[in-house]
Amino acid sequence: MSNEFEDDYGYDWQPPSDDEGRGFDDGFPFEGNEGADRWADEEDEPAKPAEKYDHHELLEQRVTVHCPVAERCGGCEWLAMPYDMQLERKQDYIEELFADYPVEVEPLMCMIDPRGYRNKVQLPLAPGKDKNGNPTVRWGIFEKGSHWIVPCKQCMVEDPAARPIIGTVARLMPDYGVTPYSEKTCTGTVRYALVRIAHATDEIMLTLVCNATTLPKAFVDAILSAHPEITTVVLNTNTERTSVILGKEEKVLFGPGYIEDELCGCRFRISSSSFYQTNPIAAEALYELAVEMADLRSSDRIGDAYCGTGTIGIVAAKASGAELIGIERNAEAVKDAEINAQINGIENATFVAADAGSEFARMARRGEELDVVFMDPPRAGSSQAFLANLSRLGPRRVVYISCDPKTQIRDIKHLVHNGYRIKRICPVDMFPHTDHVENVVLLERAPRNQFGHRRNSRKDERGGKR
């Protein structure tokens, strides 16, 4: 596991100061700030991590935020909160959420240095004017709650190599007659610049999202001359009047059209549209934790539900030699998963483009078996049909990875009712300085008695602390 990640509250970090030593509030919901109670939406469920705490205490411990756009951005809601306090709030949230179950929540896994972790940066470009009224290219972030672009040359949670590339794109555009896109008039060329950086290999992909199918070659050459570290450039065409960033058509302008990164000893191909964890340091720790929880055998048959490009399943299959069946609704992601399996020499892997619940139902009807299931559903959680069919298949272990623990606990109640027991709970801080927390739960199938019923499956689970 990377030494940049640790599983306790220790850290050695203070917010960096900029050249002018400026500090800004970040809009965190302290006393008097609008939105202080915005998480109190369900009376009978635990509040999100910051809601219940004394605002005077938070004000006393608040740190100076050295981000010139923190108030206008809103992306890092907790930037003014000391990192160890952020971790404490997230730990408390998970512990309260799972308080009805007799399983101690393990210490939250966290970053030693919670800066520069985002490997994907996508920023809009638009027409602007300088102080003399001359046309310029405006680039930066959308102001919170609007589509007004706020100039921002660096961001403390992004890889520092990304924004200078986007700045160069904006600077060179007028020299080559390349115009920024106007949302008001739907004219102009460049809508977004997207940079993806491979943490382990340092490969860099620049994707230019354009209201056009071509760009001047001299313009692309100038970008590459200024940034020889770029390994591939892709033109993504999006001519629709939409807030969706990427279009469906792409053309490779330089390099292979993708980059490759490494996680847990496996290599993964990343395109402009591929889903790939934006915090690779935390992702590696999370995957190693998930595989450890699964306790796989070489004879096992693994199900990887909502598998995306196959990352978790491939890491597990390579570590154990077990057979892998990955299920993902997005057909393009399935193609990426198949390529990733080939890259890593995983020969006993099959990927299916289907709804996970429907595929599990088909497998159950055919009498197929799964020994271990990894599930990493979207924020909305799993469907009742998926959970019912998962219970029918009856794997001995289920490793449930969630980006929304509130929907995770809802789904887990269904699995517990159908004969599973929670064995381990471990939160992971994938997104420092935000209220988001990832959570990994291991469930095991309760043993059957001689009459075929599961013993104490519900009573045991409901006997926990309150």
Placement of each model-derived feature along the sequence:
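Short, acidic/hydrophobic/Gly-rich beta-strand patch recurrent on exposed beta strands
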Residues: G140-E143, T207-V209, A337
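Rossmann-like S-adenosyl-L-methionine
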Residues: F5-Y9, E20, F24-G27, E31-E34, ...
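Nucleotide donor/acceptor-binding cores
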Residues: N119, D202-I204, S299-D300
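Solvent-exposed residues in well-ordered beta-strands and their adjoining turns
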Residues: P124-A126, R196, V209-N211, E444-A446
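Short, solvent-exposed loop/turn elements at beta->coil junctions and helix N-caps
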Residues: P107-P114, E183-K184, R191-Y192, R196, ...
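Internal alpha/beta scaffold segment
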Residues: W148-R191, A212-V234, R241
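Short, aliphatic-rich beta-strand segments
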Residues: V195, D202-N211, R267-S271
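Extended interfacial segments that mediate partner engagement and assembly in macromolecular machines
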Residues: E57-V65, E71-P180, A200
